[in-house]
Regions:
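A SIS-like phosphosugar-recognition module
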Residues: 1-182
């Protein structure tokens, strides 16, 4: 639509990104599997887990906290925008509070890295998922930041299922949804 309405400058790059996206997601999910297993073992007993990201990836953080951690696993969680981290949320950082950070490949990467640097200095239970490690860059410099949420969603699907397995708490179990009027 953008191409038809306005003449999108990076239309060909975006088309190429879409052409290879499935392969990038598949490889990213395979690459992520060992980390997902470690993450699940390290966090299976957690009562709270914060997820941080910025840019287009913030929506992935929001979905992970709301739909996966709170709805499916009953873990208290909060999506934190990396650009807002130093406006209050950084005050909860200590050696016990777990954070999952999605580091993007686009213009906002510097904000993600700044937050990660702080977490590594003052925290301990930090899991960093770096888009560069998942091959997001191969999608093309002009469009990778827009397609990266799709890759992170695929990767976090692995993480959520491994966490569910480690907790012996299926992602399909609900307390209220589909059971009581609301």
């Amino acid at each position: 639509l953008l191409q038809q309405a306005e003449g999108y400058e990076h239309y060909d790059d975006m088309q190429h990104g879409f052409d290879i996206l499935d392969d990038v997601i598949k490889k990213a999910r395979e690459y992520a599997e060992p980390g997902a297993i470690r993450f699940a073992e390290e966090h299976k007993d957690d009562k709270v887990l914060h997820v941080m990201a910025t840019g287009a990836n913030y929506n992935v953080a929001y979905t992970t906290t709301t739909c996966i951690l709170m709805e499916c696993q009953w873990i208290h969680s909060n999506p934190i925008h990396s650009g807002e981290f130093f406006h209050g949320p950084f005050e909860v950082v200590d050696k016990e509070v777990p954070f999952l950070v999605l580091v993007g490949v686009g213009r906002e990467r510097e904000m993600d890295e700044r937050a990660v640097d702080f977490l590594k200095k003052y925290g301990k239970r930090i899991t960093v998922l770096d888009g560069k490690e998942f091959g997001i860059d191969i999608l093309g410099a002009t469009v990778a930041e827009y397609l990266s949420p799709l890759v992170f969603t695929g990767v976090l699907s692995r993480y959520s299922h491994r966490l569910a397995d480690a907790r012996n708490h299926s992602v399909y179990v609900r307390r209220y949804m589909w059971h009581v009027p609301y």
